[in-house]
């Protein structure tokens, strides 16, 4: 592992344990086993490290989305994939993405850091809301809107559909964070949730 990657890993470990605001560059350098001046050869500041962590997370997410043949951010293109998926296929995709958010080291620790910091740092509170609520709801409501327009789903309010779909999944994710021993039980609920949602809103045989 190269030094830049070691710095990111050490920084994220510290951020997730102490919160972003309570970690200093010297601590990160010490955790890596280098001096602070050496760290600055790789990253200009703590914020630069933070931004690099976000970029690493995006890369990880994009790789995971690609394994499912979706973009993961573009509702227009992904609606085609979801419209052709069976109920079992949607459950499989849901499990894959849920497992990624739950177990990917960067994503898991970053979420923990944001949970800590959301009540102390307004900027990070906004980032938390954007990443785990606003962006997800926008993406999902976009997909539901397109599927309703094509007569695949029934429903006249894609935003409410997105709330109904996303909120239980986010709740299950946070419960798994707090009580990892319940993962099997909670992922069973995830499957039931996806299947019930599909059956409530599906109009055709694909979904």
Indicate where each model-derived feature is located.
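Amphipathic alpha-helical packing segments from all-alpha helical-bundle domains
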Residues: 102-115, 119-149
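Hydrophobic/aromatic residues within well-ordered alpha-helical segments
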Residues: 46, 53, 57, 61, ...
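Amphipathic alpha-helical interface segments
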Residues: 10, 14, 56, 96, ...
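C-terminal effector-binding regulatory domain of bacterial HTH transcription factors
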Residues: 199-207
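Helix-turn-helix
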Residues: 6, 14-56
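Short, Lys/Arg-enriched anionic-surface-contact patches
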Residues: 1-3
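Hydrophobic alpha-helical connector segments
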Residues: 52, 65-104, 161-162
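Hydrophobic/aromatic-rich alpha-helical bundle segments in the mid-to-C-terminal region
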Residues: 126, 130, 134, 144-195
